[in-house]
Amino acid sequence: MSRTDDIVELGHLCASYALRMTRGDITYVIENLMTADGTYSAFGEVYSLQDWPALVEAAPRGLFLCGDPELHLDGDTATGQVPLLFVDQTNHRMRMGWYSDTYRRTDAGWRLATRSMSFLRRSGDVDAGNPHDPRRPTPTGTPGEP
């Protein structure tokens, strides 16, 4: 595969994530876009894939609008950052920030290994987010693991 092919595939992966999260299709995200040991970090905590269905259930629904990823390729691994604008479907309030990702090439193609969220605040600060629902799961991910 060429570098250009890798960049196109990783861009498609990021776009698929945004569309599937907008549609609420977390099963597709887990089974087709993440590595089996993948994690998601938000609120200063690391969530494993087994936590994701409950985490998504506790989260607001809405539009995940992502820009093109900035990618750094290194053989069968890569890192990247993806701008995100989230629009809550109930009140159209927006949240903005970016994902910081690690990617791994698998037999099935490129997959997300880790994804962490950074939120931009009106004050100019950046943070990992405010927990939005006390029903969110207790995280079972391990910091630093892909």
Language model region names:
Residues M1-Y28, N32:
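Short, low-complexity N-terminal intrinsically disordered segments enriched in polar/charged residues
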Residues H12, G62-F64, M94-M96:
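Short solvent-exposed loop/turn micro-motifs enriched in small/polar/acidic residues
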Residues R23-F86:
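A solvent-exposed, acidic/Ser-Thr-rich amphipathic alpha-helical stretch
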Residues T39-Y40, E45, Q89, R122-G124, ...:
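Outer-membrane beta-barrel domain signature
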Residues A59, V87-M94, R122:
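Short, cysteine-centered beta-strand-loop-beta hairpins and adjacent loop/turn segments enriched
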Residues T79, M96-N130:
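Short beta-strand edge/turn micro-motifs at domain boundaries
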Residues S123-P146:
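Acidic/histidine-enriched, glycine/proline-rich intrinsically disordered or flexible terminal extensions
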